[in-house]
Amino acid sequence: ATTQCFIRTAQHPIHRRYCTKQQQFRYNCLNTWFYLDTMFVSTRSVRGYTCGQVFVNDTGFSRVYPMKSKSMAGKALSDLFSDVGVPTSLHTDGAKEMTIGHWKEVREKHGGIKQTTVEPYSPWQNRAEAEIRELKKQVTRIMDNSGAPKRLWDYCLEYVSELRSRTALGLPKLNGRTPYEFVTGETPDISEWTEFSFYQPVWYYNSSEFPEPRGVLGRWLGVSHRVGQALCYWILPESAEPISRTTVQAVSSDDLVTTKVQDLIIKYDKSVSDRLARGDNDITEDECIPT
């Protein structure tokens, strides 16, 4: 199958250059709508995020971009175009950060993408509202079961969104495919998500001097897409400042029952908890309130 995104005709003598600014053709063109909304939280994340922009379509594909402020919605839209592609249409609420300013500039720069908005006080008209509820539900369950600190919600949110998009659903429209494949046309490679689960204890390589051990205890936070190459992961070390590493191994079930490793994990968890508890991490109403 083929497609044709534009056509150029020549009926008159040349008097000026053709337009060379075709920003919308730098990225994949997606044959889908995206519904979107801003997700608000009560705790500032370890990376300083206070909210997140959620994009979802009608087949269950979702993409989340944590943000330090709701005013960064335009950057999240630009990142979506770069990471996934440019959709045919957008459907939002009437918030200013999703209709004017940087948002409008990004939308017009990529071909003037059609945008519609919901009727005021009618959140049921936006699929992103239901997706946010599902994301919150799954993030809460995973963080409770794993014992992860609340300030790691942004890593868990991205992890859940990526898993949902790569899980085949029972929707007739998908015909047995994953939402990711339906939207992008590519079969998703799940290699980076099969070996570890969120906040799982792991050993990661540390280039320390002799006689310090090279394998150091940490916890797995997700895939680090913008650092290194494939199979590079976010790891939470004892310093509570996430790092990216490729050389990572799960702590084996045999090691987990030994007194030595159990003591290491207790010491690690206390150190992380103490470090993440420092400072005021609650979000004030002036920082990130919905409009």
Residue ranges and their predicted role:
Residues 1-137, 181-291:
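Retroviral integrase
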Residues 112, 117-173:
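Surface-exposed, charged/polar loop-rich segments
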